[in-house]
Amino acid sequence: MVAMLFYVDTLPDTGAVAVVDGDEGFHAATVRRIRPGEQLVLGDGVGRLARCVVEQAGRGGLRARVLRRWSVPPVRPPVTVVQALPKSERSELAIELATEAGADAFLAWQAARCVANWDGARVDKGLRRWRAVVRSAARQSRRARIPPVDGVLSTPMLVQRVREEVAAGAAVLVLHEEATERIVDIAAAQAGSLMLVVGPEGGIAPDELAALTDAGAVAVRLGPTVLRTSTAAAVALGAVGVLTSRWDASASDCEYCDVTRR
């Protein structure tokens, strides 16, 4: 069984004791019921991991001694998901699935046809919730890096961001059900980075699509079916994993299998 992962702010040196408390400690000791003698992996969320053995466990956390540390290189090319704000019941699902599928960063987008509207205090509240979902999903999928979540971008702000990304060598793909280009026909493997733009339930407005493509984005379709905004990014990330070198590593070379062979 693959060892469970929990995040800490700072990883101690090899031989030192790490204290896992707060939400992570509660999840490890109370929810997952990890006990002394068991091994787990701790991560700092930015690429460094440590194999540890638990020495003490209580209701609110545990103490574990670091056996070994290592760093995981970032996956290339990196993929940023621009997610238009879905309805509340779909919002967290979209971010959760995309994190598990490998998104490296998220940008929240207030598109014209969004039913949800984040303004004022809702911006901070929404971003905090998305970040919590991303952290949980990253832990569940054993990711060495917790994807950052930023926004909320207006359409003009997104258009400017797209223009900058394209100028820097990125491929920006707008997922659209009426696109004539297929994602498999885009030379994504040669791009320095990728950006996937996912519209809201009502779709991307024609003027928004025109502005994005004028800025250098390419409208693409994933396949013959129309996907929900909550599942589109995850499916696209799967396609990108196959079409680029992101999934080239064999099982024995994956960031997590690494702990069993060192």
From Swiss-Prot:
Example GO molecular function: rRNA (uridine-N3-)-methyltransferase activity
A single GO cellular-component term on record: cytoplasm
Main location group: cytoplasm
Keywords: Cytoplasm, Methyltransferase, rRNA processing, S-adenosyl-L-methionine, Transferase
Subcellular location: Cytoplasm
Keyword Transferase in annotation: yes
GO process annotations (BP): rRNA base methylation
EC number: 2.1.1.193
Protein origin, superkingdom: Bacteria
Enzymatic reactions: uridine(1498) in 16S rRNA + S-adenosyl-L-methionine = N(3)-methyluridine(1498) in 16S rRNA + S-adenosyl-L-homocysteine + H(+)
UniProt cross-references to Pfam families, sorted A to Z: Methyltrans_RNA, PUA_4
NCBIfam families according to UniProt: PRK11713.2-3, RsmE family RNA methyltransferase
Function: Specifically methylates the N3 position of the uracil ring of uridine 1498 (m3U1498) in 16S rRNA. Acts on the fully assembled 30S ribosomal subunit.
More info: Was identified as a high-confidence drug target.
Record family assignment: Belongs to the RNA methyltransferase RsmE family.
Name of the protein this chain belongs to: Ribosomal RNA small subunit methyltransferase E
Chain's gene name: rsmE
